[in-house]
Amino acid sequence: MFYNQTVDKGKLKKLIAWAYQNYGSARCSQMADELKNLGFRFATKAGVSISVDDLTVPPAKRQMIESAEQEIRQTEQRYVRGEITEVERFQKVIDTWNSTSESLKDEVIRNFQVTDPLNSVYMMAFSGARGNMSQVRQLVGMRGLMANPQGEIIDLPIKTNFREGLTVTEYVISSYGARKGLVDTALRTADSGYLTRRLVDVSQDVIVREADCGTNRYVELTAMTDGDRVLIPLSDRLLGRSLAEDVVVNGEVIATRNQIIDDETAEKLGRLVDKIKVRSPLTCEAARSVCQTCYGWSLAHGHPVDMGEAVGIIAAQSIGEPGTQLTMRTFHTGGVFTGEVARQVRSPFEGTVRFLPGLSIRNVRTRHGDERDQVEAPGEIKLTPKDKTKETVTYSLTPGSLLFVTDGETVSEEQLLAEITSDKVQKSTEKATKDVTSDLAGEVLFSQLVPEEKTDRQGNTTRIAQRGGLLWILSGEVYNLPPGAEPVVSNGDQVQVGDVLAETKLVSTNGGLVRLAPNSREIDIVTASVSLDQAEVKVESSAGREQFIIHTGDGQSFLLKTTPGTKVQNHAIVAELIDDRYQTHTGGMIKYVDIEVAKGSRKQGYEITKGGTILWIPEETHEVNKDISLLQVEDGQYVEAGEEVVKDIFCNSSGVVEVIQKNDILREIIVKPGLLFMDLEPESSGIAQEQLIYPGTQLTPEVTIEELRQAEWVETNEGLGLLLRPVQEFTVQDQSTSPTQGSANQEGGRHIELRSVQRIFFKDGERVKSVEGCQLISTQLVLEISSEEPESVSHLTADIELEPIEDRDCQRLQLVILESLVLRRDSDNDPLGGNIQTRVLVQDGDEIPPGAVVARTEIQCKEAGEIRGIRKGSEAVRRLLIVSDRDEFILPLAVAPTVKARDLVIAEAEIAAGVLAPNSGQVLAVDKTATGYEIRLRKARPYRVSAGAILHIDEGDLVQRGDNLVLLVFERSKTGDIIQGLPRIEELLEARKPKEACVLARKPGVCQVEYQDSEIVDIKVVEDDGTISEYPLLGSQNPLVSDNQRIDVGQALTDGQANPHEILEVFFNYYVDSLGSYEAALKALEKTQMFLVDQVQSVYQSQGIDIADKHIEVIVRQMTSKVRIDDGGDTSMLPGELLELRQVETVNEAMSITGGAAAKYTPVLLGITKASLNTDSFISAASFQETTRVLTEAAIEGKSDWLRGLKENVIIGRLIPAGTGFNSHENTAGISDYTPPEEEYNYNNRSYYAPPGGLGLPPRPGFGDSSEDSDMILDDQTARAYAEGDVVDLEDDEMAFLSSRGSSRFSRQPISDRWSEADEEGEEDDFEEDYEEE
């Protein structure tokens, strides 16, 4: 065979595939080796390598980039003149650079072909040996546009290539994309690996177990297209499939049912027919497997698939492996960069254009801001050549196409005639926004712009441009006024540099004594103060901490409770008297006599309002909280001081013990000191519980009480006794004395003092649980601030200061109320606010009245000019404007101008005969001079605003440079599929709802589309039986159907991704009434299956990856095989159970024979994770996810695992039922321990090697001839078998081993009798079902 052509990568692939198909792998690999040697030999001879000289930049590049830049300069000027909006400018820039980059790429290729076809770079890239076009483009073309981290395209392209070298800016821009690529790759590997794992899990039990299931069902295959482009031709999709019925063309049978299509037949059928019915794993009726005929070829060999082939795992790997190559991320290009699918039509020759009748057009504004004619209904244009030898050409135009020529226009060769939009591609658009910021400071003026206020439901008002127009910024210097500043000039004033424009006053609210530290930013004003003039403060340190002690004139000592230099609130405690008059030695009980206290808190203590006596009955309380077994004494026992009451706890005083316990936990031990008398009775002695016994009371003739006691009857281990407990008395004065204090300048009606307060910490009758002792009463100095206006007191604080006393080493305590005022910092060069100067108007030590001005901040003018833009009243704005000479320019004219004062002039507009304005501006005045005229203009800048834009500013507002002016709202084509690549594959296979699902028609009918004013669209469908269904649309959804259009069931009415669950539901509900549940479920599942297969294919195709349909079909089959039981009827099935559709239908058929009620069900679509967890085998499900849940459920339900898949068998450690282990699986499919006697040792029934024709099939002719290089895969069993040329007699012990392996394969002792007869897998299934029912 002789080919005379250049062999590149593609041709090489085909050559090797042909050799493999025809001559097997051994010869093919030998040929591949020889080809490799050939390649290397000639590459070495030729010296193919890349050097810098090979990277030739096409000479036309410079000129191409210059023309692109020229086009962009024009666009920029149009933008500056206000002819196009920011969005249109951006779009034009992006499109210009894109087309330049593309045409440069073509130029690179042309340049190589013409000048140096043997260039190493060119040869490598185009033969497919190394590199690709996009890399070559970056080496010698231009790198093109890049996206920023948010995915928006940066409108600064990288014009250089790697051969010329990048500038710093370009390098930084391009590093965004590079980093993104690396991160993406890292994320992709993990994602794709997990996807493969889930796919394997869901399909691992799909094994070819039958030769032919005999089904009559089929799927229809057509070529896969995207718009006009054919992604996968029909011939490619047919290869290796079995036909479902004979193909007859013009009465001739081209191919028959069940024929597997090879290359030739596929080519032939692809030419002759558009759609073809084939068998598919989706429709295969083999139970829990796929049959050979439905699967077709094993694509690895180009022969029918072998029995026992694990096609599920092959499918999973075929889909999972390319996952890494899919792009992960959505490059959302900030959208303006559209994937507009418009075909450009250029004139092939010079000629005249004619519009044919029936072509209806209307004028539109294109996305570049140009006015063009757009085609409304399909029509045609005709091009008549100037050269009569050529033929007239007619072009058909689709609606939405743009015309670049007029009727009757003469066109030159290669002139652009029209951009034809593809009618197949549904143009889905979405709303997007873009901010426009101001390029100069000044005031705002609207021209032809009509604003309109809209209020939404929340009551927020937005201002929207009702009609588009120009928004002008008239130049001027804008000053931002600080808060509180009042302008001291008015509109129209002329100001010079350094004049004060506005000022802020700093006012003291309270007045008082001024304290001003040098170089400080704060002015402190003392409004009131108090000092302890007779007391000294000394610093003493105890336990390593400094303490401030106040010694008063009358010998009292106070401890300062706050640190000097800090602020204290009103009513805060400043100091506490040091005294131990009210200190107890242990805990005890407290009783008030004549004492009255004010309300207060436990933490602060209760203030004593009236003096009296405190009675204190001491007792020692140990809080223990230990086990009762540690107790060393008994309840009621008398203990001596120092005795151990609980392990490691000793009492300090003698007395009677009271034990408090709860639930065998020892809570408290109380030791009550006192005198214990045992020989008294309560009745005879007349002493009540808790009675006070006064001194001199005679208890018995021998005993007289010396001091005050409290009586308590206690139970001891010797009987009832009387305990007389000691009582301490503490006398409390009505009020304590305050140290003398002098106060100064109590201005503004304020008064400040330190008040002495006695506070008691325990309530009347309270028990103090303690061993040590406590302070009962404390005397405190409290800060009291009072004022004529009580509400102004709450926020006042006082500062604690220590003033040194002359010629003594101690200090005096002083409390002052300060008002602190902070001065503004001066700034000479605030770019937005003028020069700011602050002047202080007071001196240190001044006395000032309330309301006095302490300092004044002035905003000074930086440039001479006229004041504008001050507003009064409610409209007051914190800005003012100065129009200086820099903002104006003068044009001398020789002729009379055509403009008058206040006119707005756009750059390059005519202002007098033959005179164009150099800049845009507003005419201030037109003056006549000796030589002619003089126009004075104020610089200005127009911005084009499209209708519907959101305005951030109003007419007359003052804006700084960089302020937002408007938010342009525009429609952009959704860039491709917003979710691409892996995430989309995952969304499909996990059967997730898409984010913005489209609306599907539930019944066929005729559409009625109504557009309401507020951009809301109503779609109603008049169904065939006359019912009208309404389909509500969300705001973001655009209708895809037009008024009076006929629609079919399940058709998408709006843009967006279809939700597969909804497809299933819509079709099932539509068919169920006419066809019954089973057929409806099959039909609905088929629609969903085809949708999923096509969607997955299109994602892989968009990345240029080819996957055979059958792999996806195997996976989708696993996702769509189950139904959910709605009502079990008379069967044993439970509502909500997920079961195989065929299994349910078998039971229902049995029910219809016996007359029982059939089960009702709905088909369900399970994502791959869900399907893996709902598989028949609980071992497989448990080893995938949620192990504990799966195993506990299986245990509760008493499930059996039939060990059909690969995974279950691997886990349990047996042969897998695929490949070489398939036969043993088949023959033992129902074997119990019972074996028929005549077969006992006849192992010839079971061959231990696989003939090359595939297991279970007759061997290939010529098998065993050495003449043919057969492809064989040997394992040790097969090898032994081959060695003798026949099946070997195995040793007895090996036989025993094998037979034990064989019989244990399905050893089910408890129900063995049921299985002894069952030999076929199908029967086994029926048994399993019957068994489950019973």
Swiss-Prot record:
GO terms for molecular function: DNA binding; DNA-directed RNA polymerase activity; pentosyltransferase activity; zinc ion binding. It is an enzyme of class 2 (transferase). Residues 1299-1334 are annotated as: Disordered. Residues 1299-1308 have a biased composition (Low complexity). It catalyses: RNA(n) + a ribonucleoside 5'-triphosphate = RNA(n+1) + diphosphate. Residues 1318-1334 have a biased composition (Acidic residues). It comes from the Bacteria. GO terms for cellular component: DNA-directed RNA polymerase complex. Its cofactor is Zn(2+). Binds 1 Zn(2+) ion per subunit. Its EC number is 2.7.7.6. One of its GO terms (biological process) is pyrimidine nucleoside metabolic process. Zn(2+) binds at residues 213, 284, 291, 294. It holds the Pfam family RNA_pol_Rpb1_3. Keywords: DNA-directed RNA polymerase, Metal-binding, Nucleotidyltransferase, Transcription, Transferase, Zinc. Belongs to the RNA polymerase beta' chain family. RpoC2 subfamily. HAMAP family: RNApol_bact_RpoC2. DNA-dependent RNA polymerase catalyzes the transcription of DNA into RNA using the four ribonucleoside triphosphates as substrates. In cyanobacteria the RNAP catalytic core is composed of 2 alpha, 1 beta, 1 beta', 1 gamma and 1 omega subunit. When a sigma factor is associated with the core the holoenzyme is formed, which can initiate transcription. This is DNA-directed RNA polymerase subunit beta'. It comes from Microcystis aeruginosa (strain NIES-843 / IAM M-2473).
